[in-house]
Regions:
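Bacterial N-terminal signal peptides
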Residues: 9-17
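C-terminal and inter-domain tail/linker signature
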Residues: 21-183
């Protein structure tokens, strides 16, 4: 009986330790997303393209491959509502994210679905604020060394095999708080 109690105590301590070391609710939600529901073949193909986009192209900065998922004249609607047009501008904007957090990655899409010409995915974007963040006019925010893990979502409208409009969503206030420069 004592041996069973010892084993149960060890398991409980291990579980508490793992939970205490969990980085953020975004990475370790209390209630995980349900299992992926199979979509139509055309939607599944677009979702695979989305996975490749985030997990490989974005996370490894393979900008020469962005055309595999983005049209040349793509419109991007950013979390703050501003829009940009064109794949070259989008690449420049994406590169800017890696200036202050060179280790940014997206490695999971817990929710993936689509209908017709639209797809939607959620993800977790992680990184560490390790180099100065340019804020314009030659000014910078100095790095805090803090890690971030943001819940994000992307809605894509597809024309053929590429997106012609992409809507990006994440909480900028939460991001600034996580990197130690916001309230």
């Amino acid at each position: 009986m004592n041996k069973v109690r010892s084993i149960l105590a060890a398991v409980a301590i291990a579980a508490i330790t793992i939970a205490a070391n969990a980085d953020t609710p975004a990475e370790n939600p209390l209630t995980p997303a349900p299992k992926h529901e199979r979509q139509s073949p055309s939607i599944e193909q677009k979702l695979r393209t989305f996975d490749t986009l985030d997990f490989d192209v974005f996370s490894n900065q393979k900008w020469e491959r962005l055309h595999e998922s983005h049209a040349k004249d793509i419109v991007i609607t950013w979390p703050d509502g501003h829009e940009t047009k064109g794949i070259d501008k989008h690449i420049d904007d994406l590169k800017a994210l890696f200036v202050f957090a060179p280790d940014i990655q997206i490695k999971t899409h817990p929710i993936r679905f689509g209908s017709g010409t639209f797809t939607g995915v959620t993800g977790v974007m992680t990184g560490t604020f390790t180099t100065p963040m340019p804020v314009g006019e030659g000014k910078f925010i100095q790095p805090t060394g803090k890690r971030f893990a943001l819940s994000m979502a992307t809605i894509g409208h597809w024309s053929g095999k590429t997106m012609d409009h992409e809507w990006l969503f994440w909480d900028n206030q939460d991001f600034m708080k996580q990197i130690g420069v916001g309230q």
